[in-house]
Amino acid sequence: IRDSSSSRGLGDVYKRQVLVPLYKQGAADEESILRALYVASGIGAVIAYRACIAGAAGGCQAEIGSASAMAAGALTAIRGGSNAQIGHAVAMALKNLMGLVCDPVAGLVEVPCVKRNVVGAVNAISCADMALAGVESRIPVDQVIDCMGEVGRRMPVEFRETALGGLAVTPAGLAVKERMQRGEF
């Protein structure tokens, strides 16, 4: 399995940080990884249909949250979880990142995005572990997805990948932007 993803968002969490390491460490074979990718794709399609998966549309909760949910579901599946457990893992992963804004410094998908990917991956692993241990989401997965969509629609535009709010407009964030504009990075 080649890791050709260049994404710092959606693909990075579920593919680079969760599934590829499983394969490289010998914890899953290629067929299992491919099945997990189908599970992740199905989860992503449902989220995209019912809500959104882009930071510009719904904040980082939509991008990293969706990726984390896809990874949680895929990991639960690869480890033998039931469909119900997959749903619980997805719901918990989304709930944990609900409301997360998208505020890229200098408008680039770098800061804080790269570090949020790690949080998304850890969240996915934790939620898969909880679901496999029998922890259930009190709110059904479809309702969690719908809620995330509503939160994203109500989120001010400044917090939806515009670099007009959040960390992007802190003094340090603006200083990075100015240095980039001068060609110092």
Task: Locate predicted features.
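Alpha-helical support elements that line or immediately flank enzyme active sites
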Residues: 16-28, 72-80
